Regions:
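N-terminus-centered regions that define maturation/targeting leaders and the start
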Residues: 1-212
């Protein structure tokens, strides 16, 4: 199985229209259009009953003390953790693409509704639900896609891995909260094939960024 996008090629930069924020010289960043990117796939294995899509960033700082702080940097060698940006379940076995902007076309304060979405699909909770938990203006359950917004003072280039799973079930049973860890656990034993596409993104100025 192969996964591709009209928006970006594998291991290249994600355009700003698909991000939560874009660089801004005066304020470090500005909010963006937050559209979900186009995705398409081929070479689906026989017996596929549905697809699941997971997008995660494995480069998120494990400690947030220096994140977006003037005069400080998030060190390249700081340990990193996963941050889930998109969980989309029960994609029809006959589907072969997701249209750009079909699941997100803006930033929604307090989060988009879910888990049910158009066409009988389900959206999981992305990790902005945790990130904004202490912010009265933004706190809420963030279902569906919300794009890149890495720290503007991070020395590390962030990678956004879109992984499509072909499954042997039409409806994926998920135990507990519909978050990244629960979805990955539910996938065990049901994956016929998988394919990934990686995009990169940063809000850091060139002089700060280190490419490892």
């Amino acid at each position: 199985m192969k996964l591709s996008s009209h928006a970006f090629a594998d291991n290249t930069a994600i355009p700003g229209e698909y991000a939560f924020a874009v660089p801004d010289a005066a304020h470090h960043y500005a909010l963006s259009s937050n559209r979900n990117p186009h995705l398409a796939w081929v070479d689906v294995p026989p017996g596929t009953q549905s697809f699941a899509l997971v997008c995660h960033d494995p480069d998120v700082p494990s400690v947030g003390d220096d994140v977006n702080q003037e005069g400080k940097r998030v060190a390249l060698n700081l340990p990193r953790v996963d941050f889930y940006h998109w969980l989309l379940l029960d994609i029809s076995a006959g589907a072969r693409e997701i249209t750009a902007g079909s699941h997100s076309a803006s930033i929604t304060a307090h989060g988009k509704s879910g888990p049910q979405t158009v066409g009988g699909l389900r959206h999981g909770l992305n990790d902005y639900s945790l990130w904004f938990a202490g912010d009265p203006q933004m706190a809420g359950d963030y279902f569906g896609y919300d794009g890149p917004c890495p720290p503007w003072n991070d020395e590390r280039l962030h990678h956004y891995i879109f992984t499509l799973y072909a499954l042997d079930v039409a409806h994926l049973e998920v135990q507990g909260a519909l978050n990244g860890a629960a979805v990955l656990a539910a996938l065990q034993g049901h994956v016929l094939a998988q394919a990934s596409l990686t995009g990169t993104y940063t809000l850091a100025p060139d002089e700060l960024l280190s490419i490892d």
